[in-house]
A protein has these predicted regions:
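Helix-loop-strand module that forms the ligand-binding subsite of alpha/beta enzymes
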Residues: 58-138
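A generic structural motif
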Residues: 32-38, 139-140
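N-terminal beta1-alpha1 ligand-phosphate binding loop
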Residues: 2-35
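N-terminal beta-loop-helix "entrance" segment that forms/cooperates
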Residues: 42-59, 157
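Hydrophobic/aromatic beta-strand patches that form the interior of the parallel beta-sheet core
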Residues: 38, 112-114, 142, 147
């Protein structure tokens, strides 16, 4: 019997009641038996990228730890909202820090992007921008399956913090 595929989720939202957080927390429960899905630490504690700080102080411990967990994983699922037609600032900041590391954690790594929003197109514009960023970092961005969860607020249970809409669950699996 082979080892389970190790996949980590990177949440692009900092909000406590994040719908994307609910999607991310649902993934380990619906993953196939051959896959283990674990959440990466929150990106909330990563300071704003500053090349002067990097040169003087090196990389923050939060960035080093995040990078190591990504390196150890077989793949990454980025679960994120769309802010102002693009990538949330916190997620872009985390990626900016990761991109400066000499041993690139995302290079050659399979990455799947999942976006959700309260609007009907489910974060599609964010996906396009995020793909451009990740391709530059030599990540192996998966073209399919695409998940853009539109009107996500109607597909989750805010009490349990999980996706409850069967069509959405089917699409996620």
């Amino acid at each position: 019997m082979s080892e389970k595929l190790q996949v980590v989720t990177l949440l692009g939202s900092l909000r406590k009641g994040s719908f994307n957080g609910m999607v991310a927390r649902t993934l380990p429960k619906i993953a196939p038996a051959s896959m283990e899905v674990n959440a990466l630490p929150s990106i909330a504690d990563i300071p704003l990228y500053d090349a002067d700080v990097q040169q003087e102080d090196g990389f923050p411990a939060t960035v080093e730890a995040l990078a190591e967990q990504i390196r150890q994983a077989d793949g990454v699922v980025i679960v994120t909202p769309e802010y102002n037609y693009s990538v949330p600032g916190g997620l872009k900041n985390a990626i900016d820090w990761l991109s400066r590391l000499p041993d690139q954690p995302l290079a050659g790594k399979p990455v799947l992007i999942q976006t959700s929003s309260m609007g009907v197109i489910g974060g599609a514009r964010c996906q396009y921008h995020l793909r451009q960023i990740l391709v530059f970092l030599d990540a192996m961005v998966m073209n399919k399956p695409e998940f853009m969860g539109g009107v996500i607020q109607n597909k989750v249970d805010p009490q349990t913090g999980e996706v409850i809409d069967q069509g959405t669950l089917d699409h996620l699996t």
